[in-house]
Amino acid sequence: MAGHSKWANIQHRKGRQDAKRGKMFTKAAKEIIIAAKAGGDPVGNSRLRAAIAAAKAINLPKDKIENAIKKGTGELAGGDILEMAYEGYGPGGVALIVEVATDNKNRTVAEVRHILSKHGGSMGESGCVAWMFDRKGVITLEKDKYTEEQLMEVALEAGAEDVTDEGESWEVVTAAADFNAVREALEAAGVEMQSAEFTMVPQNEIEVDAETGRKLMRLVDALEDNDDVQNVHANFDLPDELLAELG
């Protein structure tokens, strides 16, 4: 499950690094644009509400949030963005799901295929690895603001599956169908969220050796550096020696 693996912890650290590079600003704005296609009022659009909360958590400027909403609703140009997911394999036979948001799917699929090939991976057919993952909701909260007991009381009552300790933060994990109910229950309780999003959680993880792990991390880095890539999900776990090296 999300947050229960060393790979997930590396992703958290990488997320903070990405934020410094501005990559997360682009990602957050695209998520708002896509969410706003279903309506520009966050009160009646739970996905938009979550997208705005995630954008605020990384300090995306208010004007950029407002412009992204207008692009999604068609008030401004630039909202012609499609959501897609590509499936494939990395070194060691690791399963990969690459989620993208693009205004040119032909360009993006070519770039993703090239990155995979360059780093010892390959593109697969739609559905080739998706069955190895479960769609979950993951809500992240600051560790020093809440106790586990406080979160358990609200989150589990609302239908969350688990509350996990991720070192510097808490993670509330939900089934996809219960995500909005849990997030809204936390909001109603006055809980401030660092992020609230869906993720693909591997049903089983492949343990890789350090050499394969390094190859996989280079592949993931290359994919995430692509402007159209929103998220990369994989079913591998890193060996302790590589975790220490990356940490």
Curated annotation (Swiss-Prot):
It comes from the Bacteria. One of its GO terms (molecular function) is DNA binding. It comes from Nitratidesulfovibrio vulgaris (strain ATCC 29579 / DSM 644 / CCUG 34227 / NCIMB 8303 / VKM B-1760 / Hildenborough). InterPro entries: Integrase-like_N (IPR017856), TACO1_YebC-like_2nd/3rd_dom (IPR048300), TACO1_YebC_N (IPR049083), Transcrip_reg_TACO1-like (IPR002876), Transcrip_reg_TACO1-like_dom3 (IPR026564), YebC-like (IPR029072). It is found in: Cytoplasm. Gene3D superfamilies: 1.10.10.200, 3.30.70.980. GO terms for biological process: regulation of DNA-templated transcription. NCBIfam families: PRK00110.1, PRK12378.1, YebC/PmpR family DNA-binding transcriptional regulator. This is Probable transcriptional regulatory protein DVU_2259. Belongs to the TACO1 family. Residues 1-22 are annotated as: Disordered. HAMAP family: Transcrip_reg_TACO1 (MF_00693). GO terms for cellular component: cytosol. Keywords: Cytoplasm, DNA-binding, Transcription, Transcription regulation.
